[in-house]
Curated annotation (Swiss-Prot):
Belongs to the RNase H family. It comes from Marinobacter nauticus (strain ATCC 700491 / DSM 11845 / VT8) (Marinobacter aquaeolei). Mg(2+) 1 binds at residues 10, 48, 70. Binds 1 Mg(2+) ion per subunit. May bind a second metal ion at a regulatory site, or after substrate binding. Pfam families: RNase_H (PF00075). This is Ribonuclease H. PROSITE patterns: RNASE_H_1. Keywords: Cytoplasm, Endonuclease, Hydrolase, Magnesium, Metal-binding, Nuclease. Mg(2+) 2 binds at residues 10, 134. Its EC number is 3.1.26.4. Its cofactor is Mg(2+). Its main location: cytoplasm.
């Protein structure tokens, strides 16, 4: 397995649903890479998921990943809820279809390639890399509008 990667992810949405963006900060040793993008019609939760997917997809080899998100939806989904969803055919405990199942399945596939430790960080609390991921996600939204 390749080295240790530290990843910060964030999503943003102007309106929910509405135009949204995602941002990723990847750190490997002294190297830092940032990524961002957006979608015209989406939700905040979809952008939070997309940030994690795109960050993990960017890693070319299997890595030990310390992934930080300010989304309890993403962290709890992957660490607590997903095994039940998979067991229930992507249905919730209330027998309803899992929201964003397409992205949860993509995240599951990307996660399988790596050893990922999931961490929650309080958003907008001054952590530099979380703030940068937030800035990148908002840039993804702005660029949709040609700003």
């Amino acid at each position: 397995m390749a080295g240790k990667v530290v990843m910060y992810t964030d999503g943003a949405c102007k309106g929910n649903p509405g135009p949204g963006g995602w941002g990723v900060v990847l750190r490997y040793g002294d190297a830092c890479k940032t990524m961002h993008g957006g979608e015209l019609q989406t939700t905040n939760n979809r952008m939070e998921l997309m940030a994690a997917i795109r960050g993990l997809r960017e890693l070319k080899r299997a890595c030990q990943v310390e992934l930080y998100t300010d989304s309890q939806y993403v962290r709890k989904g992957i660490t607590e809820w997903m095994s039940g969803w998979k067991r229930n055919g992507w249905k919730t405990s209330a027998k309803k279809p899992v929201k964003n199942a397409d992205l949860w399945q993509e995240l599951d596939a990307e996660t399988a390639r790596h050893t990922v430790n999931w961490h929650w960080v309080k958003g907008h609390s001054g952590h530099p890399d979380n703030e940068l991921a937030d800035e990148l996600a908002n840039r993804g939204v702005r660029e949709l509008n040609g700003a």
